[in-house]
Amino acid sequence: MGLPWYRVHTVVLNDPGRLLSVHIMHTALVSGWAGSMALYELAVFDPSDPVLDPMWRQGMFVIPFMTRLGITNSWGGWSISGGTVTNPGIWSYEGVAGAHIVFSGLCFLAAIWHWVYWDLEIFCDERTGKPSLDLPKIFGIHLFLAGVACFGFGAFHVTGLYGPGIWVSDPYGLTGKVQAVNPAWGAEGFDPFVPGGIASHHIAAGTLGILAGLFHLSVRPPQRLYKGLRMGNIETVLSSSIAAVFFAAFVVAGTMWYGSATTPIELFGPTRYQWDQGYFQQEIYRRVSDGLAENLSLSEAWSKIPEKLAFYDYIGNNPAKGGLFRAGSMDNGDGIAVGWLGHPIFRDKEGRELFVRRMPTFFETFPVVLVDEEGIVRADVPFRRAESKYSVEQVGVTVEFYGGELNGVSYSDPATVKKYARRSQLGEIFELDRATLKSDGVFRSSPRGWFTFGHATFALLFFFGHIWHGARTLFRDVFAGIDPDLDAQVEFGTFQKVGDPTTRRQPV
């Protein structure tokens, strides 16, 4: 049978045994990839600095997903939070990876068994002796089992009743840890940033799935609905399954890109909107103001800012700064962060405090402009020196650092002041090691960006797949060339040409 590449799946169209086999093999491939990828990431992951070189800076993709589900320890003796562990237990990162690989092997063997032993009694209609599947019944079984898994995850794993809980953090991604979560049954449960909603929604959705599954197991679909929705056609199953998958892909692309309790910034990096809105900058200034209100000096107030919080307020951690075709981790772009230099405060010769305008997300270059607290431009780095009025030299701008490695250091040399003004466009200033990884200095996206791009793209492709297969199954008679006005029962293969006008017509 000379099938073109895009038609090869017809070999399992009317073969339930081998249809099952290829799906088990697909599960083997997915699970095997997950386990192998986890082992690869663990081989290259450096857990030594969870603050300035976290997993998302290193381009880890599957480690964050394991961590958000409660895995924090490694058989290598390290913990994701930076400490050491002596007894990580079986469910470490390596344990989960190994379990996926073992499961993949078992699925591989099961797929081979079902390919060889395809002609099983269970797949045959006892009335006709031909292969057939009771698709509404199978739908009920799968819905029931999915409901049980969903309910179990929400009621046991997330709540810590039987399981570790999930990763929970504060709004600024500073205090994250794995902990049990109580279900949120009030209106707050609909807030995408409330972890309790994860537990309550899984419990509710699981309960609904169990009830719906039992309904579909006990109630047969009406004949008109069965025929109208082509419930006897396996391509209907394909079409509706693709719909479920593309819908889920669109949803998770949104929760990843815009942020939610399911995508903590400690595991996936900050979102672009946190840079756009000055989210971390506002929190830093609030903390400094509180420190000054407690009679701390400016230097002491800035020194109390956690390095982790300052690092979030750096444009290099913005997932929208990476180009679409710039492969590699963030560390391969601007380098490995070594330390926070401190917060630079610029002043003109009249003593006014000046603020550097920050670079918007979608700019590669941006003019260096310093404004006062009222937003009036007081200094800049001019493009044309001949026409400049606000140059650093003319205005006499100086810079002094507070907190960080350069705490208390000040510069009045114009070249140095301009250097730090340029770097202030990018947020807080960090020392970056570009030599170790031969980093090229061009920003990369975080796993947050890659996940969103991948899932949004595949969701769009799968959307078209749903339309394609849905149309094929709904209009199968039209595509097959059968005259819709034909009132005789025509059997495929009985006549030389289906829809031939010489075919005898008789009322059904």
UniProtKB/Swiss-Prot annotation:
<keyword id="KW-0604">Photosystem II</keyword>
<dbReference type="GO" id="GO:0009772">
    <property type="term" value="P:photosynthetic electron transport in photosystem II"/>
</dbReference>
<dbReference type="InterPro" id="IPR017486">
    <property type="entry name" value="PSII_PsbB"/>
</dbReference>
<comment type="subunit">
    <text>PSII is composed of 1 copy each of membrane proteins PsbA, PsbB, PsbC, PsbD, PsbE, PsbF, PsbH, PsbI, PsbJ, PsbK, PsbL, PsbM, PsbT, PsbX, PsbY, PsbZ, Psb30/Ycf12, at least 3 peripheral proteins of the oxygen-evolving complex and a large number of cofactors. It forms dimeric complexes.</text>
</comment>
<feature type="transmembrane region" description="Helical">
    <location>
        <begin position="101"/>
        <end position="115"/>
    </location>
</feature>
<keyword id="KW-0157">Chromophore</keyword>
<feature type="transmembrane region" description="Helical">
    <location>
        <begin position="140"/>
        <end position="156"/>
    </location>
</feature>
<feature type="transmembrane region" description="Helical">
    <location>
        <begin position="457"/>
        <end position="472"/>
    </location>
</feature>
<dbReference type="GO" id="GO:0009535">
    <property type="term" value="C:chloroplast thylakoid membrane"/>
</dbReference>
<feature type="transmembrane region" description="Helical">
    <location>
        <begin position="21"/>
        <end position="36"/>
    </location>
</feature>
<keyword id="KW-0602">Photosynthesis</keyword>
<keyword id="KW-0148">Chlorophyll</keyword>
<feature type="transmembrane region" description="Helical">
    <location>
        <begin position="203"/>
        <end position="218"/>
    </location>
</feature>
<dbReference type="GO" id="GO:0009536">
    <property type="term" value="C:plastid"/>
</dbReference>
<feature type="transmembrane region" description="Helical">
    <location>
        <begin position="237"/>
        <end position="252"/>
    </location>
</feature>
<keyword id="KW-1133">Transmembrane helix</keyword>
<dbReference type="GO" id="GO:0016168">
    <property type="term" value="F:chlorophyll binding"/>
</dbReference>
<protein>
    <recommendedName>
        <fullName>Photosystem II CP47 reaction center protein</fullName>
    </recommendedName>
</protein>
<dbReference type="InterPro" id="IPR036001">
    <property type="entry name" value="PS_II_antenna-like_sf"/>
</dbReference>
<comment type="similarity">
    <text>Belongs to the PsbB/PsbC family. PsbB subfamily.</text>
</comment>
<dbReference type="Pfam" id="PF00421">
    <property type="entry name" value="PSII"/>
</dbReference>
<keyword id="KW-0150">Chloroplast</keyword>
<dbReference type="InterPro" id="IPR000932">
    <property type="entry name" value="PS_antenna-like"/>
</dbReference>
<keyword id="KW-0812">Transmembrane</keyword>
<keyword id="KW-0934">Plastid</keyword>
<dbReference type="GO" id="GO:0009523">
    <property type="term" value="C:photosystem II"/>
</dbReference>
<dbReference type="GO" id="GO:0045156">
    <property type="term" value="F:electron transporter, transferring electrons within the cyclic electron transport pathway of photosynthesis activity"/>
</dbReference>
<comment type="function">
    <text>One of the components of the core complex of photosystem II (PSII). It binds chlorophyll and helps catalyze the primary light-induced photochemical processes of PSII. PSII is a light-driven water:plastoquinone oxidoreductase, using light energy to abstract electrons from H(2)O, generating O(2) and a proton gradient subsequently used for ATP formation.</text>
</comment>
<keyword id="KW-0793">Thylakoid</keyword>
<keyword id="KW-0472">Membrane</keyword>
